Amino acid sequence: MNATESVMPADTQTLSVLVENKPGVLTRVAALFARRGYNIASLAVGPTEHPEISRITVVVDVAQHPLEQITKQLNKLVNVLKIVQLEPRQTVQRELVLVKVSADNTTRTSVLEIVQMFRAKVVDAAADAVTIEATGTQDKLTALLSMLEPFGIREIVKSGEVAISRGGRALADKSLLG
């Protein structure tokens, strides 16, 4: 697989899982997916606006197994507070990519034009390479990497997808704080 091929399986679903911010919770959640034979295509975890609650955003390959089965099992875990299946059209989804690209005196201007076109930014520069930071949808980042590939991609690191529902409603409300 080259750098521009999509790594997300075609049949995926995004779950937003609110959990108690305690040691071992992520391990139990990930172990549940593994035991049930689900492939996690993307995983991002971080604190919410409430320090005692963390949000796990997980993109799951559902080609082989129905999503309903895993949500029922997740709900049985003690530290899981809430699970929401995020619908793509009602959700803002983003990933972060850092990519180190070869860029010497002869190619640097072309690389920087691509950076500008994608509203990305250069976060480090050396005589023979630049490191670029970009955020966006998976499709946008795949397109960026495709345009940078001819220059020579030296290294890529991507975050997991993070997602939030559109509109004014919040996933974590005060009722979850018990």
Where are these regions (language model features)?
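Long, contiguous binding/interaction regions
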Residues: 1-55, 59-178
